[in-house]
Amino acid sequence: MGLCHGKSAAVLEPTVEEEEEGATRVAEAAAAPAKPASPAPSAAAAAAAPAKPGTPKQHKFPFYLPSPLPASSYKGSPANSSVASTPARGGFKRPFPPPSPAKHIRALLARRHGSVKPNEASIPESGEPGVALDKGFGFSRHFAAKYELGREVGRGHFGYTCAATCKKGELKGDDVAVKVIPKAKMTTAIAIEDVRREVRILSSLAGHSNLVQFYDAYEDEENVYIVMELCKGGELLDRILARGGKYSEEDAKVVMRQILSVASFCHLQGVVHRDLKPENFLFSSKDENSAMKVIDFGLSDFVKPDERLNDIVGSAYYVAPEVLHRSYGTEADMWSIGVIVYILLCGSRPFWARTESGIFRAVLKADPSFEEAPWPTLSAEAKDFVRRLLNKDYRKRMTAAQALCHPWIRGTEEVKLPLDMIIYRLMRAYISSSSLRRAALRALAKTLTTDQIYYLREQFELIGPNKSDLITLQNLKTALMKNSTNAMKDSRVVDFVNTISNIQYRKLDFEEFSAAAISVYQMEGLETWEQHARQAYEFFDKEGNRPIVIDELASELGLGPSVPLHVVLQDWIRHPDGKLSFLGFMKLLHGVSSRTIPKT
């Protein structure tokens, strides 16, 4: 792993030589063959800087990338400190034993990309011994006739990126970026599929101003060529360094609005990027106010709203805890965005260590520090925003659309919100819930703040209620199709929406929609959660609570005969009147099932 520390980024010059500790690319499942070495400009990165002479230092393990903010170049670096003198941070002490994922990731990466020599007993990844890999992609083979390659602007372990000029066609005379992936590097069936998927995602995602524009893909006998928009403004990382290592709050908001906007767009289409970091955001021009573009979809994948991915991918400093636990969705991108905004505001990484094991351990166990400068001088809203993204429980994290509604981002401005897929997931759960749980959620909805109601009202309007201010299943489908791209077909988002069949003959007003669209887990992530819960219980006690026997409660919750009901549920019912207790109310909000009941 690259040296990961919490000192100011202002004095940290990214170099390739700082790879001794590594900046490991944790990319088991979709490490793009042409992934450029950080911090060199990546796929569409044409900051127009000529390639530096010399060959980057090579390492025994071929999947290391340099740390974007190396530290050994200054005296106070943890790299130059003993373990004993390394400063503790938020109770985070060293040395740590390596966490369980660390050792396995290298082996998985090596096997995936064919860098480990197979032994005699190994079976080719294609599943059939001795079967040659098909490296034909069906792309056009007329690249040389249409484009003239120029200087190299970035190089990774599996390919390189060049500036190029279009010789004919609609783009004649225009400069473009070309990601060149040698077929010789595609030594496994998975590596080949990674390239196919990257092109498919780039070609199917279109229409967002903060997404790098894809033009075409070509191939010949030796290479695959991915032609994209040329971004000449450099990386977000370069801008951070140029500003002395961090952004002001106001400038950070401008950056975050763009990042959240494109993230929400991708997530609605069912695409998770899986490698969001400052190096993968480029500015379209050198102008200070130029648009920012997300690039490098080499690790991206399609994900259905109710599906969990299990490939360990990403860059170590930005990888979410659930990725290391091998069960994640689009929430993993929100964690990465949380790391980015932490860096923007203070110039330090929230999770740092001297080794890859330490980084993983920090991500899994440590809490980010808000005690060191400049955090005490930053607004409470900024700190709350970061905390709600860097919550280790992915269920409590904000979505990109919700983050755009956060008081720190929105301020007094009217922000145009995108449709949020979490609304569909929550509505499906609400419709299939018991009548008692729906009553509990309606009580909770009455405690929502103005900012929370603003978000829900915007989502309600995006779904498109009828003249009576009611929404139906058809409204849900129509709203989704208005925002769809070809990526939705691969991610099967529409198939998921079709499963919300129970609402087919129902119409929801805004009050019930608010109850249906509440995430109890996200509410729990608020500092004011206990106040919400107590107030909601008071509403529920007046309007929805009623006497209930244990057997009926078990039926309401769908608990099976294997659950010792009287032992488990006796504290959930008040003995004086037989109504739900506060504990029972809280359990009901979470939708308790047999799987969540502890065994006795």
From Swiss-Prot:
Instruction: Report residues binding ATP.
Output: V153, G154, R155, G156, H157, F158, G159, Y160, T161, K179
Q: Name one GO molecular function term.
A: protein serine kinase activity
Q: In which tissues is it expressed?
A: Highly expressed in roots in the zone of cell division. Expressed in leaf mesophyll cells and at lower levels in mature stems.
> Which segments carry the region annotation Disordered?
1-99
Disulfide pairs here are none
Q: Which domain of life is it from?
A: Eukaryota
EC numbers listed for it are 2.7.11.17
What's its job?
Answer: Possesses kinase activity in vitro.
The name under which this protein is listed is Calcium/calmodulin-dependent serine/threonine-protein kinase 1
Which lineage ranks, top first, belong to the organism behind this chain? Eukaryota, Viridiplantae, Streptophyta, Embryophyta, Tracheophyta
Report the gene name: CAMK1
